[in-house]
């Protein structure tokens, strides 16, 4: 089910506090006023009274155009979303007895993922009695990490989890 975030901004009649610190439309501080008095001041200039700091004692309200304020808030949110980068984790599966050409193919794919900025989880699945030779799998993972050391850092050393051993590689951050 989709939840819709409701606007929690206190505006005009929705302000719950009796006394509020009022800031004028040009930014000058008017002082602590009763709610009714502050609302009348805002109505006289044809603007809204918007609480900008509800946790302050007393709450801080500013005389401004609420529509413009809401638009500015939405614009800031969009900018924040643009700056966020989604990091995907791509997985490459190897076997402890992988041949050299297959290893190079998997390595090429891993380097492609790392160059795109994705993290890379390289895992080895031990089948049957191969689990008795964990050191072979560890050598394969360390070789993979060594081949990628120019573009990636080891985020998590080789670790055993059930019948799988994996290593986590992260791309080197560009400055």
Swiss-Prot record:
MF (Gene Ontology): ribosome binding; translation initiation factor activity
Biological process terms in GO annotation: ribosome disassembly
Keyword Cytoplasm (UniProt): yes
Keywords, ordered alphabetically: Cytoplasm, Initiation factor, Protein biosynthesis
GO cellular component, one term: membrane
Compartment list: Cytoplasm
SUPFAM superfamilies named among the record's database cross-references: Translation initiation factor IF3, C-terminal domain (SSF55200), Translation initiation factor IF3, N-terminal domain (SSF54364)
Main location: cytoplasm
Gene3D superfamilies attached to this UniProt entry: Translation initiation factor 3 (IF-3), C-terminal domain, Translation initiation factor 3 (IF-3), N-terminal domain
Superkingdom in the source lineage: Bacteria
HAMAP family in UniProt: IF_3
Job description of the protein: IF-3 binds to the 30S ribosomal subunit and shifts the equilibrium between 70S ribosomes and their 50S and 30S subunits in favor of the free subunits, thus enhancing the availability of 30S subunits on which protein synthesis initiation begins.
PANTHER family in the record: TRANSLATION INITIATION FACTOR IF-3, TRANSLATION INITIATION FACTOR IF-3, MITOCHONDRIAL
Known partners and oligomeric status: Monomer.
Membership in a protein family: Belongs to the IF-3 family.
Identification of the protein by name: Translation initiation factor IF-3
Protein source organism: Staphylococcus carnosus (strain TM300)
């Amino acid at each position: 089910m989709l939840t819709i975030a409701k606007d929690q901004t206190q505006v005009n009649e929705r302000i719950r506090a009796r006394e509020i610190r009022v800031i004028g439309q040009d930014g000058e501080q008017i002082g602590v006023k009763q709610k009714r008095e502050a609302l009348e001041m805002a109505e006289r200039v044809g603007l809204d009274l918007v609480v900008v700091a509800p946790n302050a004692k007393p709450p801080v309200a500013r005389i401004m155009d609420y529509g413009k304020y809401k638009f500015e808030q939405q614009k800031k949110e969009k900018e924040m979303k643009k700056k966020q980068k989604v990091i995907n984790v791509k997985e490459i599966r190897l076997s402890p007895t992988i041949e050299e050409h297959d290893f190079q193919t998997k390595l090429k794919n891993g380097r492609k993922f790392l160059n795109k900025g994705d993290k890379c989880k390289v895992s080895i699945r031990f089948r049957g009695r191969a689990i008795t030779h964990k050191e072979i799998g560890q050598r394969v993972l360390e070789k993979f990490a060594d081949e990628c050391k120019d573009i990636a850092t080891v985020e998590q050393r080789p670790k055993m989890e059930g019948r799988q051993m994996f290593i986590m590689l992260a791309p080197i951050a560009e400055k």
